[in-house]
Amino acid sequence: MRHSQYLIPLIQRGYVWTLTEQIFPLWEDLIDRMDAIAAFKVDAEKVGGAEKLRALRKHFLGTVVVGSAKGGGADTIPTREVIDGQQRITTLQILLLAFRDVVKPLEDEGLDYSLKTLTRNLGKYRERGHHLKVWPTNVGRDVMQALSDAGSIEAVCDRFPVKGPKKARYERPLMVQAYLFLHALLAAQLRGVRYDDSSAEPLDELDELLNEALGEDGSAEPTIADQVIRSIEKDNVVVPPRAELPLQAERAHLLYETLRDGFQVMSLELDDEDDPQIIFETLNARGAPLLPSDLIRNFVFLQATRKREDVDALYDAHWKAFDEKPAENAKKEGERFWRKEARQGRLKSVRLDLLLYNYVSLRKCEDLKVAHVFEEFKGWWESSGKGTEFELARITSTAKHFETFLLPNQTSRLGLFCRRMQLLDTSTLTPVV
């Protein structure tokens, strides 16, 4: 990763890994390999050399597919587009950033420099973000920049609180949650405290009620990892467990050795003539299904990239709201308007999929199946002959009217009509109206 940047293109979805589903299992794998390497060292000393022992297996993290290097010069950095594996590569970068910040108090120049070269492109660059090793999609860039610049868990907590004035509640971005979790457990591990040790903290009333609602007896003692997750969800300041204990340099070096030698990632580099969109769709065909709106966004901005259009400007003007607009009456700050499920007659899908379903039906003057929206959109787009800016502007304009169908205000004739359509549970006229 020296002097290069992994660029997550707009054909990818944002960061979606969660603490319980992906980050915690990754941490378990890391500690498993760390324990194995520590035991291997002891055994090697007993038998008189590592060459007399069977080599340790490495933990396979998966495959990362990247494009060929583009650009690079005196004040620019060569970039590689990540076609598949962005969740893994982003998480590993967050892990390295957290590790970098944890070991600062040790003042170990060698370790500091090694982690610095893995988390930052050293030098002066004219483009924003070129010093970062991983540059996410537009939605995550400010977060990754903040994590890179913060330098401490305290600064990250201050930048991304969960509680605000007047009892306001915020949901920390998933990348921030990953950083806080990994930082806290890294710091604990370097103090000799394991993630599965008992936290010795009794459950509060809210957690007891939750256990009761889930039918759990609560007999299992909460662990250090449980304590950290609860703190990330509830506390403005996340304090690493047993923070009064000193950090141990030998543990830090063992952890670095584990990351360097105990994990394996397969990297595949595409040739210039390979089609990243086709490869991306093929690789994800059997994974977590992408929504039609995800595929449409990927297709549109890949086409714009090929035409050398200003993709960032197009995204900010015409698609950013689809990714970031807050939901009405949101229970949590992170809920998004266009990602909420909605029902329209016999159809049930996320709002953005329903919008695009109706939009394509309108443009093609045909009745479609919502499952075929992407294929229909792609065929219509390629035959329309209109420019990217023109068509995206029409979609965003249509979206404003579609919001009235979703949330009729009844203060206008259109709103009253949409309310009556909802009561009749009919959607036949939606594309026409």
Task: Annotate the PLM regions.
Residues 84-86, 90-91, 132-134:
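Functionally critical alpha/beta secondary-structure elements and their flanking flexible loops
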Residues 138-433:
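Polyanionic (Asp/Glu-rich) segments that form extended negatively charged tracts
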Residues 42-45, 50-51, 57, 103-142:
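Flexible phosphate/Mg2+-sensing switch loops adjacent to catalytic phosphate-binding sites
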Residues 88-105, 277:
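Short active-site loop/helix that positions an aromatic residue
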Residues 18-30, 57, 87-91, 167, ...:
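Phosphate/oxyanion-binding active-site loops and adjacent basic polyanion-contact surfaces
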Residues 11, 66-69, 86-87, 94-97, ...:
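An acidic- and aromatic-residue-enriched active-site/binding cleft used to recognize and process polar
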Residues 37, 41, 106, 110, ...:
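Short, flexible/disordered secondary-structure transition segments
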Residues 1-83, 253, 265:
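Short alpha-helix boundary/capping and kink motifs at helix termini
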